[in-house]
Design a protein with these regions (language model features):
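Conserved N-lobe loop of protein kinases adjacent to the ATP-binding glycine-rich P-loop
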Residues: 28-35
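Activation-segment/catalytic-loop signature of the eukaryotic protein kinase fold
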Residues: 76
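Activation segment of protein kinases
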Residues: 47-50, 142-189, 216
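Protein kinase glycine-rich loop
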Residues: 13-19, 24
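C-terminal lobe helix-coil module of Hanks-type protein kinase domains
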Residues: 28, 115, 121-122, 131, ...
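Hydrophobic/aromatic scaffold residues of ePK-like serine/threonine protein kinase catalytic domains
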Residues: 64, 113-114
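AlphaC helix of the eukaryotic protein kinase fold
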Residues: 42-64
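Conserved short submotifs of the Hanks-type protein kinase catalytic core
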Residues: 80-94, 98
């Protein structure tokens, strides 16, 4: 949509990003004169009754998470046949952009960011909500009280359209392959431990500048998640502490019990 377009009571300011689920715009909520992130989902998702029902349910749950490290969900609805969700606009970047622009993070900074995201996940898991797609792009980095502050986003989009074998009906795996838990690949039931696995992978990426299983194909990545132990971060970046190694290896253990 072009800047100035009004959609569902929101005036579009600019496109902020796009992905497989849809397009994110920076927008202004006209009634409250409030800047928001407006995510407009693809028509294919809007046309699927199963997804629509889950989207509404998950969005309501996400809106009830009251935690400083979770992006506030303001509204989820449908207008002119398009599903949308609006969230707090966070001024800043995201963890993916930070790693792509600057490489691996200072270990203290990486640990602080991941600890904040872990707190956000604890709050969600206490409500029975599993994120299922924890990745650097969903970790927004802003500022709060003069300090860097991490926000976990996309909670309203955590239940994907699944068919046999764990694939979505559009042919995409549930979750991002660089961080996805083995049980998600196998199409098995997921719970909070799947998010912990993914967060361990994100920590490894932040500490080393490399994803846990850098492989030439998606199939090889999936094989790694299912069968191989992730490399300890200190084997990639000498000097990282055994304590950080232990956190990553425990989070990404194949048996999460």
């Amino acid at each position: 949509m072009d800047p100035g377009t009004v959609f569902a009571g929101y005036r579009i300011e600019e496109e902020a990003g796009r992905g497989g689920m849809g397009v994110v715009y920076r927008a202004n909520q006209i009634a409250l004169d409030r800047r928001v992130a407006l995510k407009l989902l693809t028509p294919a998702l809007a046309s699927d009754p199963g997804f629509r029902a889950r989207f509404q349910q998950e969005s309501r749950l996400a809106a009830n998470i009251d935690h400083p490290n979770v992006v506030d969900v303001y509204e989820a609805g449908e207008d002119d046949g398009r599903l949308y969700i609006t969230m707090r606009w966070v001024e800043g970047s995201d963890l993916r952009q930070e790693i792509e622009s600057h490489g691996r993070l200072d270990p203290v900074r990486a640990a602080e960011i991941i600890a904040q995201v872990a707190d956000a996940l604890d709050a969600a898991h206490a409500m029975g909500l599993v994120h299922r797609d924890v990745k650097p792009a969903n970790i927004l980095l802003g500022e709060r009280r003069g300090r860097e502050h991490a926000y976990l986003t996309d909670f309203g989009l955590t239940k994907r359209v699944e068919s046999a074998g764990g694939l979505t009906q559009t042919g995409q795996w549930v979750g991002t392959l660089d961080y996805i838990a083995p049980e998600q690949i196998r199409g098995e039931k997921v719970d909070a431990r799947s998010d912990v696995y993914a967060l361990g992978g994100v920590l490894a990426h932040a500490l080393t500048g490399h994803v846990p299983f850098e492989r030439d194909s998606d199939v090889a990545k999936m094989w790694g998640h299912i069968n191989d132990a992730p490399p300890a971060p200190s084997t990639v970046v000498p000097g990282l502490t055994p304590e950080l190694d232990a956190v990553v290896l425990r989070a990404m253990a194949k048996d999460p019990a």
